[in-house]
């Protein structure tokens, strides 16, 4: 196939704006799927993707289309994840394309994530053209949304395609736009092989399958290839395309998109953004933009039933096979037993992994409150990174602590702006700007500490705005902050699973909330229990669970006071001894409830 007749494109859209449904229509129209095979959201292979309406992994499908001009074209649709946590994956998938469809809901208009991904596309020099979806809805207002696209994004939208993926309206027009507006790929099949790896996953029979976009050269079965980031060498066992089922082809050449199977055993070796080249005739250098993805949010995962520890370990290993951005290592907690400390790209990534563990592997888990990566500058000049409160060195060794900040852009209807500003101020945010995008929609931009966002920011945001807000964020930098470790002590013993790193201004309120919550949850014992919140050696809040009392005087009818006193003294002694040796069992509910205390 000549380069002139190939088009590589992706679809950019906010969650629920109809991206996967539109992809279904394109597959159906070009005959890639028969009516019988058609299932909604065909490209979202995981149940979880379909259910939450999000795309987690990239997919690539080859469509054959005969255009109005009579020529046959190959259209490669690269389906990208649309969520903020997967920004790096999106940017790599986009760099495999020459153009993108910007799908906007004709009733809702432009949302925060749409903006972020459009900017990524423009950074990668893609030609972007808008499509207004859901025009069949009664609330659709195409003219207003066209104006929004022009005002906010700066794209010319006067001739945007009007479509309804659900009803199949506008599908042909979209395909014609792809052929006419998106440029063909550049590349030279005679040069040394240079291919961009933009996704990989594990297949239990064939090892790791990698999705690639060939930029120069060609690759066929039997070739020796090398991954440039780690210099590993492999022999190609199979090359092919998805149409949308896997089809083996003789070779993939410049401009094409397809898969390579080369007996790679570990997804860790096939990193997104890497460059693949020929072992004996390598290209001059790797593609720019490759970076190792670093986890930003950490959380402890513990099985509720300790006998499930091995199952949890196997489950994590299986998930890691398909997700190189997820990391885990074993850790133990005095309170929760054996578990794992896991690293995630962000909150959605964390939720997805937890849900997959519970759903696909039937595990019951406790997750500790999410934390972020802090940088601790010690007095001896060294810098250490920590991701849990238990790793924080003693106060006397610390010079200062830095925490990560993010730049958050929040799109909200204007009646909710007051509530959003109050929430951001409460979360120690620094206001950057407020833009009125339209008379009814506002974009609020804040710098926020990631630590404050990981706990409950998103839930609070949604409840303040009745679900109308959309949030997008990017990582900024590390900043010096006044952070301390807050410990919860029960009868003088520190409960390690409940320690947290918190800003000094909030420590007192958080400590008070935690101890009063625990007072309700810890069952009464035969002796009194002191629950304290402390910073270092200084106790800042305390509650006491009163002891239950057995009436030892019940058998004394009247009689001498000294007899009664003797029995009471004896009871007092017993309680004292009990308090020294008795340890308090914390019920599981106590942990779960504490993790839900408002941040």
UniProtKB/Swiss-Prot annotation:
PROSITE patterns: G_TR_1, G_TR_2
This protein's name: Elongation factor 4
Source organism per UniProt: Geotalea uraniireducens (strain Rf4) (Geobacter uraniireducens)
Classification via NCBIfam families: lepA, small_GTP
Chief localization: membrane
Keyword Glycoprotein (UniProt): no
Example of a GO cellular component annotation carried by this entry: plasma membrane
Gene transcribed to yield this protein: lepA
Stated family: Belongs to the TRAFAC class translation factor GTPase superfamily. Classic translation factor GTPase family. LepA subfamily.
Gene Ontology molecular functions: GTP binding; GTPase activity; ribosome binding; translation elongation factor activity
Gene3D superfamilies with a match to the protein in the record: 3.30.70.240, Elongation factor 4, C-terminal domain (3.30.70.2570), Elongation Factor G (Translational Gtpase), domain 3 (3.30.70.870), P-loop containing nucleotide triphosphate hydrolases (3.40.50.300), Translation factors (2.40.30.10)
Record Pfam families: EFG_C, GTP_EFTU, GTP_EFTU_D2, LepA_C
Residues that, per the record, bind GTP: 16-21, 133-136
Domain tr-type G residues, every copy: 4-186
């Amino acid at each position: 196939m000549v380069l002139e007749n190939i088009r590589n494109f992706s679809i950019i859209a906010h969650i629920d704006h109809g991206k996967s449904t539109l992809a279904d229509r394109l597959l159906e129209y070009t005959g890639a799927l028969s009516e019988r095979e058609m299932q909604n959201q065909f490209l979202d292979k995981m149940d979880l993707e379909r259910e939450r309406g999000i795309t987690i992994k990239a997919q690539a499908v080859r469509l054959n289309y005969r255009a109005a001009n009579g020529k046959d074209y190959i259209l490669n649709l690269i389906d990208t994840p649309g969520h903020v946590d997967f920004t790096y994956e999106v940017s790599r998938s986009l760099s495999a394309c020459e153009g993108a469809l910007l799908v906007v809901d004709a009733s809702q208009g432009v949302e925060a994530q749409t903006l972020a991904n459009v900017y990524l596309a423009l950074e990668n020099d893609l030609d972007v053209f808008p499509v207004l979806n859901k025009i069949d809805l009664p609330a659709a207002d195409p003219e207003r949304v066209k104006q929004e696209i022009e005002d906010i994004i700066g794209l010319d939208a006067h001739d945007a395609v009007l479509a309804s993926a659900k009803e199949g309206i506008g599908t042909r027009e979209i395909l014609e736009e792809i052929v006419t507006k998106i440029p063909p790929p550049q590349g030279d099949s005679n040069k040394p092989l240079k291919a961009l790896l933009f996704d990989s996953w594990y297949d239990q029979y064939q090892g790791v399958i990698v999705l690639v976009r060939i930029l120069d050269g060609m690759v066929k079965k039997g070739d020796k290839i090398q991954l440039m980031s780690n210099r590993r060498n492999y022999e190609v066992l199979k090359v092919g395309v998805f149409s949308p089922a896997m089809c083996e082809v003789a070779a993939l050449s410049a401009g094409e998109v397809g898969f390579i199977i080369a007996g790679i055993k570990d997804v860790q070796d096939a990193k997104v953004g890497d460059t693949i080249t020929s072992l004996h005739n390598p290209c001059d250098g790797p593609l720019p933009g490759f970076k190792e993805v670093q986890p930003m949010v950490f959380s402890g995962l513990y099985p509720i039933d300790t006998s499930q520890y091995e199952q949890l370990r196997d489950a994590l290993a299986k998930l890691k096979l398909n997700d190189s951005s997820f990391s885990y290592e074993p850790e133990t907690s005095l309170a929760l037993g054996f578990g794992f400390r896991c690293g995630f790209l962000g909150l959605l990534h964390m939720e997805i992994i937890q849900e997959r563990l519970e759903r696909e592997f039937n595990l019951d888990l406790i997750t500790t409150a999410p934390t972020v990566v802090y940088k601790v500058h010690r007095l001896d000049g060294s810098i250490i990174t920590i991701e849990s409160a238990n790793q924080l060195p003693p106060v006397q060794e610390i010079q200062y602590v830095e925490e990560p900040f993010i730049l958050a852009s929040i799109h909200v209807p204007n009646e909710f702006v007051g509530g959003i500003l109050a929430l951001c101020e409460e979360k120690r945010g620094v206001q950057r700007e407020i833009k009125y995008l339209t008379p009814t929609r506002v974009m609020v931009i804040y710098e926020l500490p990631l630590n404050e966002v990981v706990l409950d920011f998103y839930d609070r945001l949604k409840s303040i705005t009745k679900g109308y807000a959309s949030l997008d964020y990017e990582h900024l930098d590390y900043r010096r902050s006044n952070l301390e470790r807050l410990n919860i002590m029960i009868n003088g013993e520190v409960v390690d699973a409940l320690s947290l790193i918190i800003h000094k201004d909030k420590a007192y309120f958080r400590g008070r909330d935690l101890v009063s919550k625990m007072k309700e949850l810890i069952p009464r014992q035969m002796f009194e229990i002191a629950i304290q919140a402390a910073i270092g050696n200084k106790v800042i809040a305390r509650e006491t669970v009163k002891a239950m009392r057995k009436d030892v005087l019940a058998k004394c009818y009247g009689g001498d006071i000294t007899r009664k006193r003797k029995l009471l003294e004896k009871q007092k002694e017993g309680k004292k001894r009990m308090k020294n040796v008795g340890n308090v069992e914390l019920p599981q509910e106590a942990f779960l409830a504490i993790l839900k205390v408002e941040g």
